[in-house]
UniProtKB/Swiss-Prot annotation:
Belongs to the herpesviridae HHV-1 VP11/12 protein family. Residues 484-530 are annotated as: Disordered. It is a peripheral membrane protein. It is found in: Virion tegument; Host cell membrane. The keyword RNA-binding does not apply. It comes from the Viruses. This is Tegument protein UL46 homolog. Pfam families: Herpes_UL46 (PF03387). Transmembrane segments: none annotated. Keywords: Activator, Host cell membrane, Host membrane, Membrane, Transcription, Transcription regulation, Virion, Virion tegument.
Length: 568
């Protein structure tokens, strides 16, 4: 047989009797989506703690249905994060601000005493004489907002006369600081992987945390009442209408009355909260029964610094839980931003800011999200994965009667309705072509996102008409806000407004966006209502079943296998 040369073989390909058709070879959607997802993952993976990328977490979540996260996995990740990786970016940004402000312990003590003196003078409506070098609002705000949360040791270790009382105080402070840190780890690592699927156990944990936040704010105001009583001889009156026993008993009754399914998913969280409450009870007995240390001139500088630092620490912790909710966790909350437990916690925070906002500054969710960038990075990556798996159009839905239906309908924004950024409490995720709409009606379940396929790194900004939670703010540098003075009745719910977005006088309610500049007003457009999407339930869980059976070695391969099954 004659052997053909290479050139003759190449010509043989075109000399066949039947014509050969050639297609245009281009990367398909699967390859492009995987490449984009891999590039996004490589750019964001360094900003996330190692606990969120552990193989044991991924394998357990793949074996768990209904988008649940077992509490044993959460505690395992929280205890394993010894170096505080979950808050490393946030701590680095805060420490950089503290270093830029040149805040030493002695300087912080001066700011605390001076801030409390100005707070007392303002309440008594008398002129205040500032100490030399302490009238710097920017440095004072940073010291009051961040310093106790970064430094584990108390500023003053001897606020009492007796040595045994001081030792007990230092011990209680360390226990409180460690307990708050562990609960923050728990909150950070309790998120599920699927951001488009409801998570009932995550919602139950969030509701328990909101009740816990409400209790901490009430106890903080009780402690400030105790300090004011000792300093100015009770000229102001109490700000907490119930006793300290009832403050803690209300939360313990809530934890004791949890249903069996909620108790199964929050048992270890309840134990951690009870441990913190016991430390707060011990330190309450110290401030109530023990003798406070005074200077030669009768001034109680050390007790003032200790109590202000403790209340600042608790306020920072409560803001962490609330701000992380507005930066994405509200996606899994039953009822969304209209959840009654969330609104109760926000109302208590507003009450705290109304009475003590001049002493303890607050940070809005948008500024907090810039400091804690790992939350935004994780949600960008999770949204990209969901868009690759489920397609370009995302609908947050619940399972009802064997179909998937939207949790609630988007709210219509009336043409000409003005946006006022003073009244705002919304998520600080990047905005997209759609918005996460929320409602205040009781019968609606959660928020509905609409995302564009061309924006993988976009989670819509929430538009929340929080009329009964409105509060005037005076903006300070760095995203830190202090509430303006308001009458006492402004913290009560506004009953003159109805659920249809209008007040009793017919005027439209205000819809705001925290990502806007306060000096700008966004032009309003009509948001079209999206019809419900009906999909078979089996198609939602086919990807999870595939991941359970295949057990791919990498996250990208797992996503590709899910996508192949979904497209077949």
């Amino acid at each position: 047989m004659k052997r053909l040369s290479s050139s003759e073989q190449s010509l043989e390909l075109f000399d066949r009797d039947s014509p050969q058709e050639y297609s245009c070879i281009l990367p398909n959607e699967l390859t492009v989506s995987a490449s984009a997802l891999r590039a996004l993952e490589d750019s964001l993976i360094e900003k996330l703690p190692s606990g969120l990328t552990l193989g044991i977490r991924e394998s357990v979540l793949c074996e768990t249905l209904s988008n649940k996260v077992p509490e044993s996995v959460i505690v395992h990740l929280a205890l394993g994060d010894v170096r505080g990786e979950y808050i490393s970016l946030y701590s680095a940004n805060v420490k950089r601000r503290l270093k830029r402000a040149a805040l030493t312990p002695a300087v912080v003590k001066d700011y605390y005493t001076d801030s409390y003196q100005r707070y007392v003078c303002k309440r008594r409506r008398i002129p205040c004489v500032d100490l030399p070098g302490t009238r710097e609002p920017a440095r004072s705000t940073v010291a009051l907002l961040f310093y106790p949360a970064i430094q584990r040791n108390p500023l003053t270790q001897k606020p009492f006369r007796l040595q045994k009382d001081n030792k007990m105080f230092v011990k209680c402070w360390a226990e409180i600081w460690d307990a708050l840190n562990f609960i923050q780890k728990y909150v950070y690592y309790m998120r599920p992987d699927e951001i488009t699927t409801p998570s009932l156990d995550t919602s139950a944990r969030l509701e328990l945390l909101f009740g816990y936040v409400k209790t901490l704010y009430m106890w903080a105001m009780w402690l400030m009442d105790l300090l004011d009583t000792r300093i100015v001889s009770n000229k102001f009156g109490t700000r907490v209408p119930i006793s300290i026993d009832n403050i803690f008993s209300n939360l313990t009754e809530v934890m004791g009355s949890l249903s069996s399914d909620k108790w199964m998913s929050t048992a270890l969280l309840c134990r951690s909260i009870e441990h913190l409450l016991s430390s707060l009870i011990h330190i309450s007995s110290l401030w109530t029964c023990c003798q406070w240390r005074e200077t030669k001139h009768g001034e109680m500088l050390r007790p003032i610094v200790s109590i202000v630092a403790l209340v600042s620490l608790l306020h920072h912790h409560c803001q962490y839980i609330i701000n992380i909710t507005f930066n994405g966790y509200a996606r899994w909350l039953e009822g969304g931003l209209g959840n009654p437990m969330l609104r109760s916690a926000i109302r208590q925070q507003k009450r705290f800011e109304h009475y003590l906002g001049g002493l303890f500054p607050s940070i809005r969710p948008t500024a907090w999200g810039e400091l804690e960038f790992s939350i935004r990075a994780w949600f960008e990556l999770a949204l990209a994965k969901s868009m690759v798996i489920h397609g370009s159009l995302l609908k947050k839905s619940i399972v009802s009667n064997n179909v998937l239906e939207p949790l609630c309908k988007p709210r219509h924004t009336q043409i000409g309705e003005r946006h006022d950024t003073r009244f705002t409490r919304s998520t600080s995720m990047p905005s997209s072509s759609g918005h996460i709409h929320s409602t205040l009606q009781n019968n609606q379940q959660a928020i509905v996102p609409e995302c564009s396929s061309g924006q993988l790194s976009s989670i819509a900004t929430a538009l929340w008409s929080a009329d009964e939670l409105q509060n005037d703010y005076v903006e300070m540098k760095g995203g830190v806000l202090c509430p303006a003075p308001q009458p006492a009745d402004s913290i009560t719910p506004n009953s003159s407004q109805t659920n249809n977005g209008t007040a009793s006088d017919g005027s439209p309610t205000r819809v705001t966006d925290a990502s806007l500049d306060p000096t700008e007003v966004e032009s309003s457009t009509t948001v079209a209502e999206t019809p419900p999407v009906t999909v078979a339930v089996e198609s939602v869980y086919v990807c999870r079943e595939t991941a359970r059976n295949k057990s791919p070695s990498s996250k990208v391969e797992r996503i590709l296998r899910r996508l192949r099954v979904a497209t077949d």
